[in-house]
Amino acid sequence: MATILTDKKAVVLKLKEPSRVTTVIPTAKIVKHNGATLVAVPHRPDETRVLRQLGFKDIPDPLKTHYKFPLAGGKFDPFEAQVETANFFSMNNRCFCTNSMGLGKTVSALYAFDYMKKSKLINKALVICPLSTMERTWADEIFKTFPHLDSAIVYGSRSRRLKMLKEDVDIYIVNTDGIKVIQEALSDRHDINLVIVDEVAMFRNTNERWKSLNEILNKQKPTRRVWALTGAPCPNEPTDAWAQCRVITPASKEVPKYFSQFRDTVMKQISQFKWIAKKDAMDIVHRTMQPSIRYALDDCVDLPPQIIINRDAELTPEQVKAYRDMMSKLSMEYAGGQVLAVNEAVKANKLIQIACGVAYGSNGEEIVLPNKPRIDVLTELVEESEGKVLVFVPLTAVLTNVADELSKKWSVRTVHGGTSKTERDEIFSGFQSDHEPHIIVANPGTMSHGLTLTKGTTIVWYAPIYSNDIYEQACARVRRPGQTKTTVIAHIAASEVERNIYKRLATKQKMQGLLLDLMKEGEIH
């Protein structure tokens, strides 16, 4: 029988043979109490795992016993799914978390890190994540929920990345494509003993990016703890799981050494170049991708009806140039008193157009700018979503391009001012009743009051709109009677103007004065 001393954070055992524990747990100590010989073991995850293997099944989870969870975002108690996920991370050195988008995989991993650091089992962490989540997701969550932790964004030129990696902080955040630059420098960083791989499905192919991660996780310091996060482990085929498992849990007996072995297990060849998934493919993926934890939105009864998430997109060089040119023009107009409350929405919209891939020449001609990073972020969000998706694109000039890109992988229909009522009715009926379309790409102004699209569980705003009423009505399309699931509202932004518009939309603040305030404060960029 084990006794937990919460003030000492220790497990006390009365054993006939203390050596049974002391020989396998170096931190265990023999103590005398009232003439009895007892064994005291630190009540931490590593020791608890060994004790359970020895047969002491009644040892409670250390994190849930001792950790005082900070308020998420400084405001909210963690959901049950977040507590259980954090606890799961703490009890597994290498594992997967495939919780649905919006359930707080980020904060769960940070809760576990915070606890493990306080327990002196982890020193520093490296977070590898998409560029879109570096600042708006990871850095923001650390700042709001864990103000006692320091972080560094390892991004920029090679010299800047290496400089940031030398900073004495608790958590280093690097984008997925930046790990090769710091790969060699990490070989000497034994203090970084946890790696969190966010959106691990981006490593579903054994390319150069995968090889860099494999070097960091399995060759430099195989004892590093590794927690892998993704809401969609197999966005294309069941075979997507193989490379992820080979890099995260290579020692698992469930993971075949060669891709062809795994492919033959989950896929059936029907012609020389065509394979289809077997009926039990996803069951095999689940068995292979272990240890893992998953909560779906439907599993969580303590969630709010809507969850808002923010994703950053990078501007292409062509967009950066056009954006700077427009900013120079606006700055001169502002200095000359030409930016007024009555025209600021039009001027702000020009910046949003550029961020979405459209500019206009001196004669008013439309110029299409490369915007792949924003499309990539949108694709990531659709892959992570559960159920059907509404994508709102306020700019008609961009809407067709967005739909064309998405239609490469999913069934897509578009709704805009030129869509007839008959066609709209057909699209909405199919969305609600049929398997297709999977995605509706729409101008938000065309989504009328009273329209019900409850088969959709995710709304993605490709860009913000300068109207509280249209934003609120568009978001309400999926929050209607008959909606039984928590819905996710995702905002994509590439500029401070967009982020501030979203902030005001989410809190129902008036839009008037937004651009003027930003220019006055010198924060617009």
Segments the model singles out, each with a brief description of its role:
Residues 62-98:
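Conserved pre-motif I regulatory segment
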Residues 122-124, 151, 167, 194, ...:
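Conserved P-loop NTPase motor "coupling/switch" region that bridges the ATPase
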Residues 466-525:
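A conserved SF2-helicase RecA2
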Residues 133-157, 248-251:
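Conserved helix-turn-beta segment of the N-terminal RecA-like "Helicase ATP-binding" lobe
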Residues 108, 113-121, 126-129, 303-327, ...:
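Conserved Helicase C-terminal RecA-like lobe
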Residues 180-185, 236-238, 398-403, 424-428, ...:
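SF2 helicase motor core recognition
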Residues 92-112:
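Walker A/P-loop
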Residues 106-108, 121-144, 235-240, 394-396:
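Conserved Walker A/P-loop ATP-binding site and its immediately adjacent core
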